From Swiss-Prot:
Gene3D superfamilies: 3.30.40.230, 3.30.720.200, Anticodon-binding domain, Bira Bifunctional Protein, Domain 2, S15/NS1, RNA-binding. Catalyzes the ATP-dependent ligation of glycine to the 3'-end of its cognate tRNA, via the formation of an aminoacyl-adenylate intermediate (Gly-AMP). Also produces diadenosine tetraphosphate (Ap4A), a universal pleiotropic signaling molecule needed for cell regulation pathways, by direct condensation of 2 ATPs. Thereby, may play a special role in Ap4A homeostasis. Pfam families: HGTP_anticodon, tRNA-synt_2b, WHEP-TRS. InterPro entries: aa-tRNA-synt_IIb, aa-tRNA-synth_II, aa-tRNA-synth_II/BPL/LPL, Anticodon-bd, Anticodon-bd_dom_sf, Gly-tRNA_synthase/POLG2, GlyRS-like_core, tRNA-synt_gly. GO terms for molecular function: ATP binding; ATP:ATP adenylyltransferase activity; glycine-tRNA ligase activity; protein dimerization activity. Residues 1-28 form a transit peptide. Belongs to the class-II aminoacyl-tRNA synthetase family. It catalyses: tRNA(Gly) + glycine + ATP = glycyl-tRNA(Gly) + AMP + diphosphate; 2 ATP + H(+) = P(1),P(4)-bis(5'-adenosyl) tetraphosphate + diphosphate. It is found in: Mitochondrion; Cytoplasm, Cytosol. This is Glycine--tRNA ligase, mitochondrial 1. PANTHER family: GLYCINE--TRNA LIGASE, GLYCYL-TRNA SYNTHETASE/DNA POLYMERASE SUBUNIT GAMMA-2. GO terms for biological process: diadenosine tetraphosphate biosynthetic process; glycyl-tRNA aminoacylation. Glycine binds at residues 296, 347, 575-577.
Length: 729
């Protein structure tokens, strides 16, 4: 996706923003970064201004008190001055508290978030949801192992993803190798542009990601330094908004301006320079075939387009999907499961006619309302707001129906998993974030203790990827539309005069020729008009990263009329890309909760996972250690297994209340307690309510609720209630 990358994988859009330098554009200047003015909250701005004034007043009054004491002024005069100083200090303290409250409530405060995150992570590691890889050898940053409950949740998430997308939409699933030849990633742009900017400690050589150091500095200043002026705070927020687009020179200038040093040693830092994030390898024993561990799964789908198109009966639209591992050699991994060096992606490439991006099932999602964050709201400093998806498409906020359809389907997928819909938003990419070939891009962002985390990218990438691989491989990756009757069409013909271009540009001739031939019709006709009126034109060649002067004798541009029996075109691609690890971590945070024990002397942790994704659907507890009850538990276990319900029997002598608490902490939604040889109770985790059912009914009831055929409310209304006040004690 571009995604991602902030988490495990860097935002793919950022990758492809860089990719745009390889493609041509006409009569455009090289990309320049205009500051995006993000208006500061009016209350925060007012409080910062007030605090600055109060600080000045306190300082001035303090000087006045010292001057009175130095001049041996009368005691009443000194006392009055001290009283005024104390009054000013109290006013300053009040403003500081108000400002700190505003910062915390706006999501910038870190103390509560850090405490919550620590509680979640401690529970996850203690219950073996995940653990650092190779822990007995001190581990390696950015590598984690999923333990038994973590594996179960991941399996359930991917199973539902297949059902929700691949089966529902009749997608074609593929499984491509992780090891990818260099030529493939050269064509896609990854070899040249899949980079982050890195700095080194000039004395120890320790590496850091440059933008992270700048982000940490700005964030800490905004959160903890209440003395900075409103103007300085606005400047820092502007830097946070645009720093992903900083060039190495701009980023280095900011690091020097703010005096940022190595976090561990306070040593000076080197200038930022690009570091390619792919793991390089060689294929075969000769070492002559260079390759990389794939940074995304999408390229495997693109290079197989021709075969998939034929497999689908040469019909559009169709979608191909892939679930698999991807790799990113992070400079300084942090944020736990959110930024790792190996991760699971689930990606969809939906191929569609660029002249018809309607979707037959759009009406199924058109009435959905959820938080959306269009670029206009971002630019004006507003917040995300609830919009009707159908209206957003109709007004052009979302570019087309197919893109809108997948946004709606992603929303349904995430909320069914257990993501809180009030902490889920769809943010549209700003103009400076998008590659020039992209029609529209949205990210599904989930709020966590780390802030808003990009977990799914949904992008209309036009025809860029298929064209790039067509050009590099020489294999046309195109689709056809046959006409019932021949049509007379006008075709754009661009003919570079290679002799003249060779004389003018010598070794750069090939770059200029490719750029001229890659122009779209609008760009070509604009060039033609300028050449006819002025005889020359400035033409920006992305692969050279500079403009060149094109004269009238260097290129011929015309339109010819032809009769055609079919239309051959390169399909556009709508691409939803899912960072599975990020989604799962955000799910952990959204489902984590605490509640007091019966005695009220401690807080008990629990995960409120929906049955759909819970690692274990049900536990079976004999109420007491009793051979008869244990035999009944084994019978129920067999019945649960026969209907495909994951479960666990606990026949330890521990009290039933402690066993409930233990499984609540794993997020198990249901517990069957055996206290008879004819009937049992079923306990629901969140409410702690219990019903009594017969032995024969137990497995079918748990199965029906786990699979969504019934709700717990249905069960509660159907079966006798059971009360056991002591059970949870």
């Amino acid at each position: 996706m571009r995604i991602f990358s902030t988490f495990v994988f860097h935002r793919r859009q950022q990758i492809f923003n860089l990719r745009q330098f390889q493609t041509t554009t006409i009569l455009r200047n090289p990309i320049s970064i205009a500051p995006i003015q993000i208006p500061m909250d009016a209350t925060e701005q007012s409080l910062r201004q007030s605090l600055s004034e109060k600080s000045s007043s306190v300082e001035a009054q303090g000087n006045a008190v010292r001057a009175l004491k130095a001049s041996r002024a009368a005691k009443p005069e000194i006392d009055a001055a001290i009283e005024q100083l104390n009054k000013l200090k109290l006013e300053k303290s009040t403003v500081e508290k108000e400002l700190q409250s505003i910062i915390s409530s706006s999501g910038n405060g870190s103390l509560n978030r850090e405490a919550f995150r620590k509680a979640v992570v401690n529970t996850l590691e203690r219950r073996l949801f995940y653990i650092p890889s190779f822990k007995i050898y001190s581990g390696v940053a950015g590598l984690f192992d999923y333990g038994p409950p973590g594996c179960a949740i991941k399996s359930n998430v991917l199973s539902f993803w297949r059902q929700h997308f691949i089966l529902e939409e009749n997608m074609l699933e593929v499984d491509c190798p992780c090891v990818t030849p260099e030529v493939v990633l050269k064509a896609s742009g990854h070899v040249d542009k899949f980079t982050d900017l890195m700095v080194k400690d000039e004395k120890t050589g320790t590496c850091y990601r440059a933008d992270h150091l700048l982000k940490d500095y700005c964030t800490e200043k905004l959160e903890k330094d209440l003395t900075i002026s409103a103007e300085k705070a606005a400047e820092l927020k502007d830097v946070l908004a645009v720093m992903e687009d900083f060039s190495p020179e701009q980023l280095g200038a900011k690091i020097r301006e703010y005096g940022i040093t190595a976090p561990d040693t306070k040593n000076p830092l080197s200038d930022p320079y690009p570091f390619n994030l792919m793991f390089q390898t060689s294929i075969g024993p000769s070492g002559l075939i260079p390759g990389y561990m794939r940074p995304e799964t999408a390229q495997g789908i693109f290079v197989n387009f021709k075969d998939l198109y034929y497999y689908n009966g040469k019909k559009l639209p169709f979608a191909a999907a892939q679930i698999g591992q991807a790799f990113r050699n992070e400079i300084s991994p942090r944020q736990g499961l959110l930024r790792v060096r190996e991760f699971t992606l689930a990606e969809i490439e939906h191929f569609v006619d660029p002249e018809n991006k309607s979707h037959p099932k759009f009406s199924d999602v058109a009435k959905l309302e959820f938080l959306m964050f269009p670029r206009e709201e971002q630019m004006s400093g507003q917040s995300a707001k609830k919009l009707c998806l159908g209206e957003a498409v109709a007004k052009g906020t979302v570019n087309n129906e197919t893109l809108g359809y997948f946004i709606g389907r992603v929303y349904l997928f995430l909320t069914r998993l257990g993501i809180d819909k009030e902490r889920l938003r769809f943010r549209q990419h700003l103009a400076n974030e998008m590659a020039h070939y992209a029609a529209d891009c949205w990210d599904a962002e989930i709020e966590s203790s780390y802030g808003w985390i990009e977990c799914v990218g949904i992008a209309d990438r036009s025809a860029y990827d298929l064209r790039a691989h067509s050009d590099k491989s020489g294999t046309p990756l195109v689709a056809e539309e046959k006409f019932a009757e021949p049509k007379e069409v006008e075709k754009l013909v661009i003919t570079p005069v290679k002799k003249e271009l060779g004389l003018a540009f010598k070794g750069n001739q090939k770059n200029v020729v490719e750029s001229l031939e890659a122009m779209n019709e609008e760009e070509a006709m604009e060039m033609k008009a300028t050449l006819e009126s002025k005889g020359e034109v400035e033409f920006y060649v992305c692969t050279l990263k500079k403009s060149v002067n094109i004269k009238k004798n260097m290129v011929s541009i015309s339109k010819e009329k032809k009769k055609e029996h079919q239309r051959v075109f390169t399909p556009s691609v709508i691409e939803p890309s899912f960072g599975i690890g990020r989604i799962i971590y955000c799910l952990y945070e959204h489902c984590f909760s605490t509640r007091p024990s019966k005695a009220g002397d401690e807080q008990l942790n629990l995960f409120r996972f929906p049955p759909l994704v819970a690692p274990i659907k049900c536990t079976v507890f004999p109420l007491v250690q009793n051979q008869q009850f244990e035999e009944v538990a084994k019978v129920i276990s067999k019945e649960l297994a026969s209907v495909g319900i994951s479960h666990k029997i606990d026949i330890t002598g521990t009290s039933i209340g402690k066993r409930y608490a233990r499984t609540d902490e794993l997020g198990v939604p249901f517990a069957i307690t055996v206290d008879s040889d004819t009937s049992v109770t079923i306990r629901e985790r969140d409410s702690k309510d219990q019903v009594r059912v017969t032995l024969k009914e137990a497995a079918s009831v748990v199965s029906s609720v786990s699979e969504g055929k019934m709700t717990w409310q249905d069960v509660w209304a159907t079966f006798p209630h059971h009360s056991s006040a002591a059970a949870d004690e």
